[in-house]
Amino acid sequence: MDVDVKRLCVRIMLSVLLLLGLAACNDRRPLPQGDTYVIRNDGGGQLISAEADRAVLRLWSGPVEIEGYCNSACLIFTTLDNACLDPELILGFHGANITVGFVGNPQVSKYLRNGIKQKFDDEWQHIPFTEIHRITAQEYVALDPQTRICS
């Protein structure tokens, strides 16, 4: 096969993979606007989208308040340095529907800290993705004292 044809095939394959990756990331949260970014009643969604959104919020560095409920992939926002938990927040944990290598449960676990990480690794990651274990913001902070309650 000619070198130019090989290069063209590689470019086409890389373009297709890029498009597939972008298509998989289809539940992004809105970009930050204003003084405070509020995450409210977030059921989670695709982990790859949450990771991208977390990176945006980390770089933005404005205050992030998490209110209502925060389940599943939303949990990775709780450890942002600029995040705080509303005192009435309920947080929900379960295992990933797909866990292969570093994908799924290890992807969530790497963002957690202290007692929350320990509980997730030891217990909560084994909860089927069709069920959920809920805790309050106060219970969360008791397990991860680095996390702040919003004032």
Regions inferred by a protein language model and the residue ranges of each:
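C-terminal motif of bacterial Sec signal peptides marking the signal peptidase cleavage site
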Residues: L22-A24
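Bacterial N-terminal signal peptides that target proteins for export
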Residues: D2-M13
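Surface-exposed patches in mature extracellular/periplasmic domains of secreted proteins
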Residues: V64-Y69, P87-I90, D122-I127
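N-terminal secretory signal peptides
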Residues: N26-L80, P145-S151
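Sec-dependent N-terminal signal peptides
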Residues: I12-L20
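Charged, glycine-interspersed solvent-exposed loop segments at helix/strand-loop junctions
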Residues: T36-I39, A52-S61, F102-S151
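Gly/Pro- and small hydrophobic-enriched strand-loop and loop-to-helix capping segments
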Residues: N82-G104, I149-S151
